Structure formats: structure tokens, C-alpha cells
UniProtKB/Swiss-Prot annotation:
This is 3-ketosteroid-9-alpha-monooxygenase, oxygenase component. Binds 1 [2Fe-2S] cluster per subunit. Binds 1 Fe cation. The keyword Iron applies. Its EC number is 1.14.15.30. The keyword Metal-binding applies. Residues 24-126 form the Rieske domain. [2Fe-2S] cluster binds at C65, H67, C84, H87. InterPro entries: Cholesterol_7-desaturase, KshA-like_C, Rieske_2Fe-2S, Rieske_2Fe-2S_sf. Fe cation binds at N173, H179, H184, D302. Keywords: 2Fe-2S, Cholesterol metabolism, Iron, Iron-sulfur, Lipid degradation, Lipid metabolism, Metal-binding, Oxidoreductase, Steroid metabolism, Sterol metabolism. Induction: Induced by KstR. GO terms for biological process: cholesterol metabolic process; lipid catabolic process; steroid biosynthetic process. The gene is kshA. One of its GO terms (molecular function) is metal ion binding.
Length: 383
């Protein structure tokens, strides 16, 4: 019997981008690169070298020496230059060759690519633009004053390589209300997106599921208010306000990534926690460690999905799925020439998802799960 194919919706996987996103990309905490050694970073389909000069200023260059292709990240830092391990050619942070030790003269015009850098909140950023334009002041990553205040912990930082996925997979999460229930085991009772200019924001109120314990971002009877904003294509600041009964905890989560290739990226996340009054530093550190562990479990829940899903350019949506297509239009501004950015990519857009029906259905599921758990526990006790 022939299979009925009329009305079947096919998945359009589309094509991967032909360039990397324009914008600031976070490489990690400054302290990770400030040990006097050159560090390699695989990013944007190439390799970069990061090194600190004698004043502690961080510099980023193309990693491969323009002389004979040696890997500068395998070399050494000598004064204000990074020295190639192959023939000791010295390169300054401005990209100019400063010295060829064995030569009568150093080529005056010898240059490699030097990358724009910035430091915000103790984190190092590198600028990428397919057209080669310098960064504009209005898209600079905002400062994170809490990190400087002395009243918050230092960054608890994690990173991992995600292979087989494009960066857009993580961006889609900004509009995905329902995955908080199914992947992160919470009940999102309020969910709103606002996109404007180079910023995309998510506002969330989430309560824990009583039928789930110790699963990452599930917090039992805890309540969470969250404001999360992407500043450009790859760096999110997430202000988290957690309530556990009478106890309140303030924290900031950084959710960021940078592309390695078009189908792989490095996912990074970091947490700082406001030091609760009356707690000593050791206890505060334990609190920060515990919170970071929970956040890490949450990211790994997402990673498990990304590892096995397909890219889909034509997702089939229901009302509660929110502004997926609008989010992708916003994201597209970073993958076209500046002259080709259209108003629908940057004009202000707001959407609040009505979670009422979803929460009603989910609460029924939660109660059924609790009933089944109670019956299973009773049966186990009587056996």
C-alpha cells in the first residue's frame, strides 16, 4: 500500500553561514591569559595567539608566523613581543615584526593580523567583522560593576567544545519557553522577549517542579526571576534572583560562546554570587560552587539535545513557542554586511508568551507524577 505523503511537512536544514558573526566574542577570564605564556585559541575557522605584554596588557594576533608558518602560541613571550618557536621572529601586539634576531635588518613592512580586544568585568573579548570594520562604541559590552565591587565572588568559569552544532542552536533558547519545563525541569509562569538594536532580552519567572529532584536547574520549591540579555551575537549577561523560602540569593550568570568552525563552537559559562552578609569566605565559596554546579548541569541538559538534533530552518510552531522567527531575523544582522542590515532585524519587537494553558497542563502532569511516585514508594515499603 502506498504511503500517503500529501501534507507531510519536510524539514529544511538550510545551509550553514558563509561567514562568522560580526561582534564581540568572549575568550574567558583575563587571569587565564595573564601567566606570561602565549595561549592558543581556535576560533573563526583559524587559530589566534593571546599573550600579555610587560605591562600586563593582553594582545591577540593570528597564531601562524608570517615568516615560515610557525605557531606563535607554541613560542615564548619576550618583553612586549611573542617570539616564534621556529626562528625567533618577534611580533608585537600591534602586529608589527619588531625583531629578527639573526638578520642584518628587520623588515619594516612585516605585519601580521592584530585583533581588537577589550576587557569588561575581568573578561577578555576579541572583535570579529567579516568586512574588517573596527568596533563601534555603541555595541561595546557593558561593564559588570558587581565583579569590581568586592561584594561578589570571583568568576567560577567553565567551558566545553560543542561539535556538530552551529552557534544558532544556543541562540534559539532565548525564545524557548517550553524547554524550561522539559529540559530544565522548571515551571515558567512568565516569559517575555524584547529585541532592539544589537540586544535581545528574555524575562522569565520560574518555579521549581516538586516532582523532580537534583536535576540541574530544578530548584524544588524555589522561585527564580531572571533577566537575560544578549549583547551582540554571542555574549549573554543573565541576572538571577533566586528565592529559597526566606533565603534570597543574587547571582550573575554569563552564557557565552565563540565559533570554532561553522559546525562547532566553544560554550562558556561563568557565575559570580553576591556574598551573603554574615557568611565567611569559605562558606560563600561553597555556595558559589554549588550554584555553579547546578548551572553546569543545566547547560549539559541543553548540550545533550544539541548533540542529537538536526538543524531546522523551518520549525513548525504553536503559539506558545513564541518569537523564534523574529529572534532569527534579529540574529541575522550579525551575518550580513552593515549596509544590508534591514529595519526588521533591529527595530524594537516585544512578545509576551501566554503561559496559562501550558502551566495548567504541566501542573496536571506534575500531580500525576507525584501520585505515581507516592504509589511506587508505598509499594516498595510494603514489599
Amino acid at each position: 500500500m502506498a504511503t500517503e505523503t500529501v501534507g507531510i511537512r519536510e524539514i529544511d536544514t538550510g545551509a550553514l553561514p558563509d561567514r562568522y558573526a560580526r561582534g564581540w566574542h568572549c575568550l574567558g577570564p583575563v587571569k587565564n591569559f595573564s601567566d606570561g605564556k602565549p595561549h592558543s585559541v581556535n576560533i573563526f575557522g583559524t587559530k589566534l595567539v593571546v599573550f600579555a605584554d610587560s605591562k600586563g596588557e593582553l594582545n591577540v594576533l593570528d597564531a601562524y608566523c608570517r615568516h615560515m608558518g610557525g605557531d606563535l602560541s607554541k613560542g615564548t613571550v619576550k618583553g612586549d613581543e611573542v617570539a616564534c618557536p621556529f626562528h625567533d621572529w618577534r611580533w608585537g601586539g600591534d602586529g608589527k615584526c619588531k625583531l629578527v634576531p639573526y638578520a642584518k635588518r628587520t623588515p619594516r613592512l612585516a605585519r601580521t593580523r592584530s585583533w581588537h580586544t577589550d576587557v569588561r568585568g575581568g573578561l577578555l573579548f576579541v572583535w570579529h567583522d567579516h568586512e574588517g570594520n573596527p568596533p563601534q562604541p555603541e555595541v561595546r559590552i557593558p561593564e559588570i560593576p558587581e565583579w569590581h565591587s568586592g561584594e561578589w565572588t570571583d568568576w567560577k568559569w567553565n567551558s566545553m567544545l560543542i561539535e556538530g552544532s552551529n552557534c544558532r542552536e544556543i541562540i534559539d533558547n532565548v525564545t524557548d519557553m517550553a524547554h524550561f519545563f522539559y529540559i530544565h525541569f522548571g515551571l515558567p509562569t512568565y516569559f517575555k522577549n524584547v529585541f532592539e538594536g544589537h540586544i535581545a532580552s528574555q524575562y522569565l519567572h520560574n518555579v521549581g517542579r516538586p516532582d523532580v529532584n537534583d536535576l540541574g536547574t530544578a530548584y524544588g520549591e524555589a522561585k527564580l526571576d531572571s533577566e537575560a540579555s544578549y549583547f551582540g551575537p554571542s555574549f549573554m549577561i543573565n541576572w538571577l534572583h533566586n528565592t529559597y523560602g526566606e533565603f534570597k540569593a543574587e547571582s550573575i550568570l554569563i552564557n557565552c560562546h565563540y565559533p570554532v568552525t561553522q559546525d562547532s563552537f566553544v560554550l562558556q559559562w561563568g557565575v559570580i554570587v553576591e556574598k551573603p552578609k554574615g557568611l565567611d569566605d569559605a562558606t560563600t565559596e561553597k555556595l558559589a560552587d554549588a550554584f555553579t554546579e547546578g548551572v553546569s548541569k543545566g547547560f549539559l541538559q541543553d548540550v545533550e539535545i544539541w548533540k542529537h538534533k538536526t538543524r531546522i530552518d523551518n520549525p513548525l510552531l504553536v503559539e506558545e513557542d513564541g518569537a523564534v522567527y523574529q529572534m532569527r531575523r534579529w540574529y541575522q544582522q550579525f551575518y550580513v554586511d552593515v549596509a544590508d542590515i534591514t529595519p526588521d532585524m533591529t527595530d524594537r519587537f516585544e512578545m509576551e508568551v501566554d503561559t496559562t494553558a501550558a502551566v495548567e497542563k504541566w501542573n496536571i502532569e506534575v500531580q500525576e507524577n507525584l501520585k505515581a511516585q507516592a504509589e511506587a514508594e508505598k509499594a516498595e515499603q510494603s514489599s
